[in-house]
């Protein structure tokens, strides 16, 4: 395979014209037809992107501009969110409610930390778009560097159906709980998706305590959190408001056991964030006995 990527130039001149072998040309065409970018192919040969584009043009391949690439519709299940009638659809709707960017031009974008990149693959698999590429970027906040993974998909049908379910552009201050869009028996999956996207679970150990105490928090609009609070049977807890964002925090290992058992009810790997699931598993390992009380809808 190493010989495949070895470049031969005319007269062995480092700046001379590249003499491509038939195998190299076939490889380039095959990679491009399988939706690999010209930049990615060029990096394999250590040549410029334009060199790859020239090979494609000379072999009658249509080379798309960056604008055209952004608009291309690769095969996917565009009807995925048409009806929320399964655990996976409820989960991903909740996740996009919390952590998805929905553009006016038909774009869905999800940004996650690099450590959660596998979660993007789970979403792509859910909508039958595993061929779509995951991109990477670096974000700087308060002099701290964050490495991110993200996907960007353009699909007007997906975006329209999401909008019909209340997941809209600039949603952070106007989201309402989709009581008429998500069946009651799927609430746990929707809330888990929302929790994975815009919630936290962590622990702290008081000085005299033998075991760590856990707490979970949800963040969002007042309407969203009031509905989540009611479903979790925690109407006695107050919401906190800071910079137009509300939060709901629940502490105490005993009550968290019942809440987390509801959130993770009938969950499985494809519809849960692995990192948070591991924290929940550690929490269960530290609990001793006791049956969790019932929360959620009957």
List the predicted regions and their residue ranges.
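Internal intein/HINT superfamily modules and their associated LAGLIDADG
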Residues: 2-298
């Amino acid at each position: 395979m190493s010989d495949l990527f070895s470049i031969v130039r005319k007269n062995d001149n480092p700046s001379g014209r590249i003499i491509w072998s038939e195998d190299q040309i076939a490889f380039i065409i095959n990679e491009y037809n399988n939706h690999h970018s010209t930049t990615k192919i060029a990096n394999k040969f250590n040549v410029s992107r334009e060199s790859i584009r020239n090979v494609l043009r000379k072999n009658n391949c249509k080379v798309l501009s960056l604008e055209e690439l952004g608009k291309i519709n690769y095969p996917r299940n565009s009807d995925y969110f048409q009806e929320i009638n399964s655990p996976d659809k409820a989960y991903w709707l909740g996740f996009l409610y919390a952590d998805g960017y929905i553009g006016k031009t038909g774009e869905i974008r999800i940004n996650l930390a690099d450590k959660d990149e596998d979660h993007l693959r789970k979403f792509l698999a859910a909508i039958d778009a595993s061929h779509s590429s995951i991109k990477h970027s670096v974000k700087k906040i308060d002099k701290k560097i964050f490495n991110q993974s993200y996907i960007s998909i353009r699909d007007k049908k997906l975006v329209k159906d999401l909008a019909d379910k209340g997941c809209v552009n600039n949603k952070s201050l106007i989201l309402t709980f989709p009581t008429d869009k998500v069946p009651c028996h799927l609430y746990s999956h929707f809330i888990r998706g929302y929790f994975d996207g815009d919630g936290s679970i962590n622990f702290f150990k008081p000085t005299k305590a033998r075991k760590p105490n856990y707490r979970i928090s949800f963040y969002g609009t007042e309407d969203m959190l009031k509905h989540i609070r009611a479903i979790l049977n925690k109407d006695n807890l107050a919401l906190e408001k800071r910079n137009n964002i509300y939060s709901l925090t629940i502490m105490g290992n005993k009550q968290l056991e019942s809440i987390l058992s509801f959130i993770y009810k009938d969950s499985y790997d494809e519809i849960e964030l692995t990192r948070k699931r591991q924290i929940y598993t550690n929490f269960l390992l530290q609990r001793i006995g006791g049956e969790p009380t019932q929360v959620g809808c009957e």
